[in-house]
Amino acid sequence: MRSTFTVVTPAADPSLLTIEQLRAAAGLVPGDASRDAELTELGARVSADIATACQIRGDGVHVPTLRSEEVREVFRQRGCDDLLFLARRFISDLTLVTEAGTALVADDTDLDAEAGLLQRISGTRTLTWPRGDAVVEYTAGFETVPPDLVGAAMDLARLRLSAAARDPLVKGESVEIPDVRTVRQDYWVGAVPGSTAGPVPADILAKLSQYINVAVA
C-alpha cells in the first residue's frame, strides 16, 4: 500500500547525536570545540546512514530522520483495506484524519503509535477504509533520542573516526629496528574481513532492530 508522503514541518536538527556526544566519541575533553565542524558533518552522515539502514521514508526534499517531524500522507483507497501502514513510526500526535473528504474524530480510529498502524473502527467493530483518499497528518519520531539509539549512533561515529585514522586495507604491520628502520605492511587482497556492503555494520544494525521499518507493498 503506497501513499503520497510529505514532510510538513522538518526536524530542526535531524542529527541523532549532540555535539557534546560527538566530542566524547572522538575522545575530546568536554568543551573542546577544535573539531566541531568535522564532527558536525560526521554526525549528519551517521544519522543519515542510520535512517537509510532503518528504511526511514523521505519526501525527496528533506533528509530522512528518526527525529520528530510533522508529516502528511495521502492514501488512495480501493475500499478493501482495514489498516493504514503509516510511513513513519513512534507517533506522538495524530493531528488529522479524513476519509473521502470527511474529517474523522478520535473515536473513529485506533492507532498503534509505535508500529505506525492506523485502523478504522466504529465502537468495537473494525471497518474497511472506503474508496477515495484517506489523508493522515501526524507527528512522528523522537524529540529526545532514546539511549539505545544514541549508543548505536555513538558506536558508528567511533567506527568512522577509527576508519579515518587508518588504512582499512592494511592486514598487519611489522617494524624492524637493527640497521635503519624497516616497516613492512601486509595488505588484504579482495574483501576485507568484517566489512559490510551497507552503510551500517551488522553488529550495530542488530542494535537498531526495533527502529527498522518493514517494507509494505
What is each stretch, according to the model?
Residues M1-A217:
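Divalent metal-cofactor coordination and adjacent catalytic microenvironments
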